[in-house]
Amino acid sequence: MTCPVIELAQQLIRQPSISPDDKGCQDIMIAHLQTIGFTIERMPFGDTNNFWAYRGIGPTLAFAGHTDVVPAGDESQWEYPPFEPTIRNGMLYGRGAADMKGSLAAMIVAAERFVAAHPNHNGRLAFLITSDEEAKATHGTVKVVEALMSRNERLDYCLIGEPSSQHRLGDMVKNGRRGSLTANLTVHGIQGHVAYPHLADNPIHRVLPALQTLVNTHWDEGNEFFPATSMQIANIHAGTGSHNVIPGNVQVQFNFRFSTELTDSQIREQVETILKNHNLNYTIEWILAGQPFLTAKGELVNAVIQSIDQYCGYQPELSTSGGTSDGRFIAQMGAQVVELGPLNSTIHKVNESVSAADLQQLSRIYQRVMEQLIQ
């Protein structure tokens, strides 16, 4: 007997949807949702396909995810072709199996089963799907959220299918994420010959003490939900490539992953104070990739915990660890946001895979969340 979750996951994996190219994945999902009475609104922006689908009225529970995947890399290194889904020893192999086409299949089948059992359900069940999460994330969820907010759409709960599990299905869910703020700093000096330093001004020498101060700064203590804010230097570039030329400029890129104890404005102000105290001639560009967000225990978190406990026999750890996700955009709508998906140990790797049994169980967990919140 075949499993609809696995069949749909395989169908999605067969589409080589390298970000931001959807390659027809959303058409497959939409066909399933239309069959059970969902209203579909396609929302393309730029090079990205998105859709918003909903059924029912009232408090809204949305399932969110992305159809795009990262490139497979050297396909000769794969045990099985990355876009030919293969099941071996209970594992489903293929690019996107864990991140996150397996979750998408589990969501769709959960919705089909939920609607079949509760055709006149209370509340509204919705899907927010994009093909621009793995790359630039500029024409995907962020644009859909902007459009929905502009017309005062209501979103109460959102479950994102990102692969959150660590060692066994459902052992960890993300109920928040740190903010991400990047600085592109250029320190200006005067180019010259290394033999005549008095006729030049070496920007590398000037910036190093300031960077050391930034590295040594204790930004905050964190709190019960978030670790302390982290600042990391990512890139430094200067010089002409010649050993005898003092460079005229040095570019430094550094990133903050920050907790709810700080705002991005406070970080910017503190950084610029340090730079000015070191008498640097500089320009700086700031890129805010996302604000920190947190969903404390409440209806959605409680429903997810209970559903995992029912099907797995244990309760998950709530965590805000890891990088950013599209949850940072959805949280702007005032929704409670939680991320729950399969194990993440093989995501973006050669031989990406997920347990077929886990996907089937994940679909049941998703369905149980629906039943608790909008039945």
Curated annotation (Swiss-Prot):
Transmembrane segments: none annotated. Binds 2 Zn(2+) or Co(2+) ions per subunit. Zn(2+) 2 binds at D99, E134, H348. GO terms for biological process: diaminopimelate biosynthetic process; L-arginine biosynthetic process; lysine biosynthetic process via diaminopimelate. The keyword Hydrolase applies. It is an enzyme of class 3 (hydrolase). Keywords: Amino-acid biosynthesis, Cobalt, Diaminopimelate biosynthesis, Hydrolase, Lysine biosynthesis, Metal-binding, Zinc. One of its GO terms (molecular function) is succinyl-diaminopimelate desuccinylase activity. The active site is at D68, E133. It catalyses: N-succinyl-(2S,6S)-2,6-diaminopimelate + H2O = (2S,6S)-2,6-diaminopimelate + succinate. It comes from the Bacteria. Its EC number is 3.5.1.18. Signal peptide: none annotated. InterPro entries: ArgE/DapE_CS, Bact_exopeptidase_dim_dom, DapE_proteobac, Peptidase_M20, Peptidase_M20_dimer, Peptidase_M20A. Its cofactor is Zn(2+); Co(2+). HAMAP family: DapE. Homodimer. Catalyzes the hydrolysis of N-succinyl-L,L-diaminopimelic acid (SDAP), forming succinate and LL-2,6-diaminopimelate (DAP), an intermediate involved in the bacterial biosynthesis of lysine and meso-diaminopimelic acid, an essential component of bacterial cell walls. This is Succinyl-diaminopimelate desuccinylase. It comes from Photorhabdus laumondii subsp. laumondii (strain DSM 15139 / CIP 105565 / TT01).
